[in-house]
Amino acid sequence: MLNQPAPEQISESALLRLEDVSRVFDISRGLFGDRRSLVAVDHVSLNLAKGASIGLVGESGCGKSTLGRLACGLLAPSQGQVLLEGRPLPPAGANSWAAGRIQMIFQDPFSSLNPRLSVGSAVAEPLAARGVSRAERRAQAEAMLATVGLGGMGDRYPHEFSGGQRQRIAVARALITRPDVVVCDEPVSALDASVQAQTLNLLREVQEQFGPAYLFISHDLAVVGFLCRHIMVMYLGQIVEEAPADALFAGAAHPYTQALMAAMPTGSRRGEPIAALEGELPSPLAPPAGCRFHPRCPKAKDICRREAPQWKELGAGWRVRCWEA
């Protein structure tokens, strides 16, 4: 029997709520092969308050990008529901009450920008569905480009900008509708360290100015810890630990979280180094029995191989799925 979300994860005052959300993909093997089910997201709940920032961290293939797409309506859940201010979230692109209220920033800004549109037109495009006049769209786009440090460049095209500048354009486009929520899917992973820092500072500044809530997705705990006060750790479709950022960095409880911390640059973490993660992520088509992390866990015992751990509460807003925590 699945544990219910803790009160601090689900509340009536949540801006964006994911309630026991799962997403299953049917995978066929060859032209006449059997169809198999891939559970990309497995019974995940979260509560994102107005103006808050939640970090979602895990290795590539753990399901975090799928969860991000569920959160903004690009995918529909196979089970559970996504609510915005208590109302079911309609599909992205629908001409509805929720249009423009949740936006997404992708990992590759170049592929998310139309090369045939000037960046001013690309930034202004989301306003067209709201009936904003062309002149007003242009004025708002120029103002938003100035906000992200690209004032006076609206007539240029994406290929004329560096990777960091293109990500600034993507930030401007995401903010043009004054969204309540911005889902940031690995927005700095393709950038070098100095440009990463500039982009993260920009995201913090625009949050202070415009107040959107962030669901920030990354494989890098150091990046997530810079921007987010609450962190959720995902492994093979499940959340295995979540905690306030300070508590997590002071003493992560799950061996997987500890291994992610060990992969951080030395200056980014506190305390003693922890054994690095070994082995490959198992296939989500055939997840291990019991605790899904047990094949890679240095602390695994027999019960870990037999039974899936339930949530264990460790403090306010802090819980973990681990028999040894």
Feature annotation, model-predicted:
Residues 2, 7-14, 28-32, 37, ...:
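Short catalytic/signature loops enriched in Gly
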Residues 31-35, 88-103, 121, 129, ...:
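ABC ATPase NBD coupling module
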Residues 72:
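Helix-to-loop junction immediately C-terminal to a conserved catalytic motif
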Residues 128, 135-152, 205, 261-262:
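Conserved ABC ATPase "signature" region
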Residues 157-161, 165:
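Conserved ABC ATPase signature
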Residues 176-180:
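A short, proline-enriched helix->beta-strand linker immediately N-terminal to the Walker B motif
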Residues 183, 191, 195-272:
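P-loop NTP-binding/switch modules centered on Walker-like glycine-rich loops
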